[in-house]
Amino acid sequence: MPEPAKSAPAPKKGSKKAVTKTQKKGDKKRXXXXXXXXXXXXXXXXXXXXXXXXXXXXXXXXMNSFVNDIFERIAGEASRLAHYNKRSTITSR
């Protein structure tokens, strides 16, 4: 039994790389990840702007809530405009 255990780690390393590549290609939840990243970007920007002041967790949660609310309002307005204009897609023109 020790022999298969020795040979198993080398293929696992290669297979892990292949698995992560396929997971990235098949990952369709990018929209949810983008919304969560907004809070991290806002916290990083606040830390860069005022290095002396530390951002509390409550402040980060409030900023995250604000950004998510704005995104939801923009998406709702875009949906309404698309419905009013009887268009299935929204363009920048």
Curated annotation (Swiss-Prot):
Residues 13-28 have a biased composition (Basic residues). Monoubiquitination at the C-terminal Lys gives a specific tag for epigenetic transcriptional activation and is also prerequisite for histone H3 'Lys-4' and 'Lys-79' methylation. Phosphorylated on Ser-15 during apoptosis; which facilitates apoptotic chromatin condensation. Transmembrane segments: none annotated. Belongs to the histone H2B family. It comes from the Eukaryota. The lineage of its organism: Eukaryota, Metazoa, Chordata, Craniata, Vertebrata. Pfam families: Histone. Gene3D superfamilies: Histone, subunit A. The modification N6-acetyllysine is found at residues 6, 13, 16, 21. SUPFAM superfamilies: Histone-fold. Residues 1-12 have a biased composition (Low complexity). Its main location: nucleus. Core component of nucleosome. Nucleosomes wrap and compact DNA into chromatin, limiting DNA accessibility to the cellular machineries which require DNA as a template. Histones thereby play a central role in transcription regulation, DNA repair, DNA replication and chromosomal stability. DNA accessibility is regulated via a complex set of post-translational modifications of histones, also called histone code, and nucleosome remodeling. One of its GO terms (molecular function) is DNA binding. This is Histone H2B.
